[in-house]
Amino acid sequence: MTIGTTDIFLLVIIVSTLIVGFFWGAARSVLLLAAWVLAFLAGAHLKTDLGSYLAREWGQFSVAYNDMAAFGVIYVGLLLAAPVIIFIGTRGNQRISKYQVLDDLVAAVFAVFVAVIGIGGVIIVLATFYETGPGALDTGGGPQWTATLYADLVSSTIGGGINEHILPIIGWVLGPLLPSDVREVFA
């Protein structure tokens, strides 16, 4: 097992969410999980609409790439906006039990879980273009940096583990709610 630059970056994300979740509160962390589901499903279902707009604006990229980019923009945009909206929308004590340490631990675990499935979501978004069809990782339809990001994520130790173990669970849980082209990633 080797730890590369991508693994260090993913580890920093996961540990950062552990710390933030510990101080943020259990109720907010549970809301963040719901926001992840909403962001992922919204991105999966709205990607074609935004993708057709991007295809008109970015004629140099393929339609499949524009759909993937639209999925990513919606997913990442909502996922980044969610903590701000949750923080502004919640007031007062965020405890769910009478034991502060239990609340802090539950919040940290939920935050780490959201970070892991958030990384998994990015892998799924990229896989909708790079993992399907012939010429996987062929950058003819998109810029090189997205292909490199996908290759680095799935070949890293942490990203590969998420890809192998977490993504099938996401596919099993959310599969019936996803469009068929996104479900193909889990096949």
Describe the residue ranges of each PLM region.
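Alpha-helical transmembrane segments and their juxtamembrane interface "caps"
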Residues: 1-187
